[in-house]
Design a protein with these regions (language model features):
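Metal-ion/cofactor- or nucleotide/acyl-coenzyme-handling active-site neighborhoods
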Residues: 1-186
Length: 186
């Protein structure tokens, strides 16, 4: 079984910093801490901030901004109405339909954390609970159309399939080792 790693905005994704996870799709500022295959940036403010960071040639950049505002070399993301985390899950399903998805850093969606520095720093309104509820509803809406997707969590969820941090780390390390032994095929 092959896996695609999707990194949300929550601080818990930092537990996986030193592991080469390929293929991987990150949201917004995950590019600071991870070597990603793909990066999804949610809006103009984030695009502006991410463009200040050094460009990584191994990463394909995607944004939801209008084509008039898409930076040179970036790709337009065609998932209207989805936040960056949900769009990253949808992109993983589109690009790697035969892979199982391991979703890391979706703490707000799972009701585990109030921390999400990106979302709340740029958008102090609406309230964090409203944002989390909207993101949760979006994930639940697209969840049935995704390949098998497991969310990394320390507790179970009534709707979304979860996996422990230890299990996810083991999968990431195992797949990372196999990357050096055989060429990857989607």
């Amino acid at each position: 079984m092959r896996y695609t790693f999707v990194l949300g905005n929550a601080p818990s994704q930092k537990r996986f910093i030193d592991i080469r996870m390929q293929p991987s799709i990150g949201c917004n500022f995950a590019i600071k801490d991870h070597k990603l295959t793909h990066l999804i940036v949610a809006d103009r403010m984030a695009v502006h901030e991410v463009r200040k960071l050094p460009t990584r040639t191994e990463t394909k950049y995607w944004c939801k901004a209008s084509p008039l505002e898409t930076p040179p070399g970036w790709h337009d993301l065609e998932f209207p109405g989805l936040d960056s985390g949900s769009a990253a899950l949808a992109l993983a399903a589109e690009l790697y339909p035969n892979n199982e998805i391991i979703a890391i850093g979706f703490d707000g969606v799972l009701g585990l954390s109030d921390e999400n520095a990106y979302e709340y720093a740029f958008r102090p309104n609406p309230k964090p609970e409203q944002i989390r509820a909207r993101h949760r509803a979006t994930v639940e809406q697209i969840y049935p159309d995704l390949p098998r997707t497991r969310f990394v969590s320390y507790q179970s969820d009534p709707v979304l399939e979860t996996i422990s941090y230890d299990q996810a780390l083991k999968i990431a390390i195992t797949q990372s080792r196999s990357l050096y032994q055989e060429p990857y095929q989607a």
